[in-house]
Each structure stands twice: as C-alpha cells, then as structure tokens.
C-alpha cells in the first residue's frame, strides 16, 4: 500500500550549553520501590501510547525513547504547569532553538506516581495530536526497566534491575549521547552503524546520509542495494523542516541486530541521526534495562531472522516559505509522480478550496481512496491541476 508522509516529528535533544537556564536532570521521584507493574498500551501507526493521569486528569502519553525528556505542545489540555525557565533544544531536522521548560503536576502510569517530571514546551506543528504529552527516555534512564509487547498490548515496568535477566532475547549495549540510547547495528556486511533507538520514529530503519556515504565509499556492495536517489527533504522536527538534500532509497539485504537478521528492509537516508524506529515492535518484544544499559529484542515467532519486505514513503510535504504545503520529496515510482505532481510544487487549492497554510492541508478531511483535484503552482510560477488519490 502506498505510504504518504505528512509530518515526521522525532528527536528532541536537550543540549547542555553555557547559556541555558535549565539543564537536563532526573530529579523527579517515584512513589514506589521494588515494584513490578503491567500497564496497558496502545500501538497505533507504529507509535506507543499509554493512558495515565496528570494532576488527577486523564492524559494520553506517547512514549518516545528518542526524546531525552518529556515534552508537550502549547495549548495542551495539561494544566497546573510550573515554569522552570528555558533550555536549548535540537530537533529531528537538526534545528536549534530556545524553548520553555515546565514541571508537570503529579502524573501516574499504572500504580506508579511520578512527581516533579520536567517537559519542554513546543509550538504546535499540527492542528491536533492523538496524545497530550510525550514521555522521554529520562523515565527509564532514571533507573527503570521495561518490556514492551505490542502484540499483547502491555508494558511491564519495574525498578528491579535483575527482573528480566533470565528472559530470552538478543541484547545490545547502548551508550547515551545527549541522554538518549545509541546502539550498533549492521546494515551491510562487514559494516556497522551507530543508531538511535527511537520509538518516536515510525520506520524500522533510517540512515544518516553522511554515514551512508562512508559505507558506500568503502564497499561496492552498498550501491547494489540502492533503489533510487532523489533530491528533497522530508523530515520536519519540532522547530522546522530539514534543508533539501539528496535522499537515498535502499532495499537492504539484511539489517542485523547482533545475531538476529531483519531481511529485505526498505530504508531511506536522513540528515538526522540513523535510527531504529518503533515498527521493530511489529516483529518482537523489546526490553530496555536502564540499569545495565542494554536493549533486548525477542522475535514473536522465534528463530534468528524475519522477512520484513516493508514499504517506505514515496512523497513528503513540508511547509514552504509562504507557509503553504510544498512537495518536499517525490519518487518517480510514486502514483503522485505519474499523475503529474512534481517536487517543489506548492499546493494552492484542493477541489477549488484555497489552501492558505500547511495547517489547512493537514486539517483537510481527506477520505482514503477518494480522488481530489489539486491546484498546484510549479517552480516556474505556472499553475496547473493534478488528480490526487489519498
């Protein structure tokens, strides 16, 4: 099935600088010790959601291990926030900016109450979100272990460092960079790549473009796994879109997690960090041990490999200079390209209704399978109409 990307929101890394007014810390507290709790989760569109409360009110959290700390958006229904100042933050597209930092009221996850949890506050990039706040990797880095089973719909959370020691699984040590976990995987034979384990990213694997270039320089085997090259941009972080550059689409023979192989993996390059994303949970459980700094993968079906044969994005829309949606990335193999859409086209109207902003485009009530007429302005300034099937 064709995949269309409207927005990718990912990595939030709080940087320690001389000018910051609030630094990374894990001074929040847990209400329990020596506990084990099984908490229901939802995994929707390769994102992990947990129901809890903040200040006694229901709250839907998104668990994002690629975010160093919690975050929420201006206008969130979360109330009772206490300002802590500002911090310099870097997003998935590599943008830097100063953002507000707040302390949340007491929040609960299952039986656990967490006090003094800190979150960054960002401008809304979408008119609405399917969650109220993000829980970052600091939740585990503080000293917790968790096991996530998307198939069963639960997460086991514990502060017992040895609780999962005797469970099966293929483990990788991680090291913290900017307070988030990086592991070593092998995308090509005799090659390793340092990747962020990022449940805020949907795709199984994306590779940093500079890392790809190094791999390709060292081995002709890398180029044989390239399907297409396109100039454009597709990642939008909390602070803006990445700059246009070459994006490489690949079909990897295998992606190795230590001794386990994901076979026939489609992936693409990005200007941000290489990442393993939340769709790894389609194929097995993940256990994160915040004490031993290890991440374990256990395939649902056992064995030492799984056939992935996934699809990747073929088109991406990003905000243009005038605020309208622009085709930031488009492959020649896509239905949109065959219909006449071109990279750099600005979306001016949908079925004759003007699109004044990127948010208008995001809000449009598209129906899956229905065909629309887009009025687009090409890079030559000329307008034309293109059929578009959602």
Functional labels for PLM-detected ranges:
Residues 1-24:
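Bacterial Sec-dependent N-terminal signal peptides
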Residues 19-390:
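Pepsin/retropepsin-fold aspartyl endopeptidases
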């Amino acid at each position: 099935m064709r995949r269309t990307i409207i927005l990718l929101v990912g990595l939030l890394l709080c940087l320690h600088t001389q000018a910051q007014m609030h630094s990374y810390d894990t001074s929040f507290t847990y209400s329990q010790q020596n506990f084990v709790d099984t908490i229901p989760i939802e995994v929707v569109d390769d994102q992990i959601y947990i129901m809890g409360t903040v200040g006694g009110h229901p709250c839907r959290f998104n668990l994002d291990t690629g975010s160093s700390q919690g975050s929420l958006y201006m206008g969130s229904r979360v109330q009772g926030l206490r300002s802590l100042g500002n911090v310099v933050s870097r997003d998935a597209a590599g943008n830097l900016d100063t953002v507000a930092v707040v302390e949340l009221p007491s929040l609960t996850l299952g039986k656990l109450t967490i006090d003094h949890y800190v979150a960054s506050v960002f401008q809304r990039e979408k008119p609405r979100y399917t969650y109220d706040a993000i829980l970052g990797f600091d939740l585990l880095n503080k000293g917790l272990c968790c096991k996530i089973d998307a198939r069963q719909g639960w997460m086991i959370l514990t502060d017992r460092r040895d609780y999962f020691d005797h469970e099966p699984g293929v483990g990788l040590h991680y090291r913290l960079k900017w307070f988030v976990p990086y592991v070593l995987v092998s995308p090509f034979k005799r090659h390793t790549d340092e990747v962020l384990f990022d449940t805020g990213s949907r795709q199984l694997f994306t590779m940093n473009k500079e890392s790809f270039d190094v791999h390709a320089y060292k081995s002709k085997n890398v180029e044989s796994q390239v399907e297409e090259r396109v100039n454009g941009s597709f990642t939008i972080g909390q602070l803006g879109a990445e700059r246009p550059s070459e994006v490489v689409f690949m079909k990897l023979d295998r992606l190795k997690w230590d001794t386990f192989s994901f076979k026939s993996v489609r992936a693409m390059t990005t200007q941000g960090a290489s990442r393993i994303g939340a769709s790894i949970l389609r194929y097995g459980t993940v256990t994160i041990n915040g004490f031993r700094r290890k991440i374990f993968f256990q395939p649902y079906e056992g064995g030492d490999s799984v056939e992935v044969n996934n699809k990747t994005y073929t088109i991406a829309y990003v905000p243009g200079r005038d605020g309208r949606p622009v085709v930031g990335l488009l492959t020649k193999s896509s239905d949109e390209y065959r219909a006449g859409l071109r990279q750099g086209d600005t979306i001016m109207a949908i079925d004759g209704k003007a699109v004044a902003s990127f948010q208008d485009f995001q809000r449009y009530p598209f129906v899956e399978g229905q065909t629309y007429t887009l009025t687009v302005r090409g890079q030559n300034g000329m307008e034309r109409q293109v059929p578009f099937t959602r």
